[in-house]
Amino acid sequence: MFRGVGTAIVTPFKNGELDLESYERLVRYQLENGVNALIVLGTTGESPTVNEDEREKLVSRTLEIVDGKIPVIVGAGTNSTEKTLKLVKQAEKLGANGVLVVTPYYNKPTQEGLYQHYKYISERTDLGIVVYNVPGRTGVNVLPETAARIAADLKNVVGIKEANPDIDQIDRTVSLTKQARSDFMVWSGNDDRTFYLLCAGGDGVISVVSNVAPKQMVELCAEYFSGNLEKSREVHRKLRPLMKALFVETNPIPVKAALNLMGFIENELRLPLVPASEKTVELLRNVLKESGLL
């Protein structure tokens, strides 16, 4: 589907409503700086608080702006298989290139339940499906063996966003899924694990940091793929303070504050999320200045 950087883009709000004008500026900023895909309505896009009509508006506008230049992948995960399928079919109807389907959360399915969840959805859509493993939020972990089983059996499941920070799991997930199917893709779901995942044989990152620093995140991956390991490592090291600062509070609270400081969006979230503290805003201001982004 893509190699490199897919930006998990924020959803701007203004006075409680979608701010499509600011959103267009942000999408164009991503395109101008060479990102390889956009992921709409993921965790960073505050998908739990965006209603069905707003989803349609946001996805449609994204597809209009992008105009086929890069893939548009839509977040479509819930903890109900049938509700998830409904969101997948909406994305399919709107013309998305793929869907990001988070593991069912709260109800804590077994590994067999996870497999059957993705099997059920994959049999009912032609879209490429990306498994999203983020156990820190969901309470359930896709084991490498399960990811490999999915890769082997479900041909329109194109890859996994691996947001388990454990480096042993990253290694095993990349190794076992690539053995199961050579074209199965593994993206880091944690910006600070991107360089490591690339070294393990992965394919890039679905990134929060690239909302703010798309050029630098693209460079990190591009240099690695070009064989310039030390240059890629250097870019990673320079980005570390920003990677750390953007997660001092729950994502997407800090990244929205950073984009507000940069003049892209209002610093507005929907409850139960609230804007960043003054301490966090000051930290972000300093890090953005040091990074040459302010």
From Swiss-Prot:
Primary localization class, coarse: cytoplasm
GO biological process per UniProt: diaminopimelate biosynthetic process; lysine biosynthetic process via diaminopimelate
Annotated pyruvate binding sites: 44, 206
SUPFAM superfamilies attached to this UniProt entry: Aldolase
Pfam families: DHDPS
Superkingdom field: Bacteria
Alphabetic keyword roster: Amino-acid biosynthesis, Cytoplasm, Diaminopimelate biosynthesis, Lyase, Lysine biosynthesis, Schiff base
Pathway(s) served: Amino-acid biosynthesis; L-lysine biosynthesis via DAP pathway; (S)-tetrahydrodipicolinate from L-aspartate: step 3/4
Compartments where found: Cytoplasm
Role of this protein: Catalyzes the condensation of (S)-aspartate-beta-semialdehyde [(S)-ASA] and pyruvate to 4-hydroxy-tetrahydrodipicolinate (HTPA).
Protein name: 4-hydroxy-tetrahydrodipicolinate synthase
Higher taxonomy: Bacteria, Thermotogati, Thermotogota, Thermotogae, Thermotogales
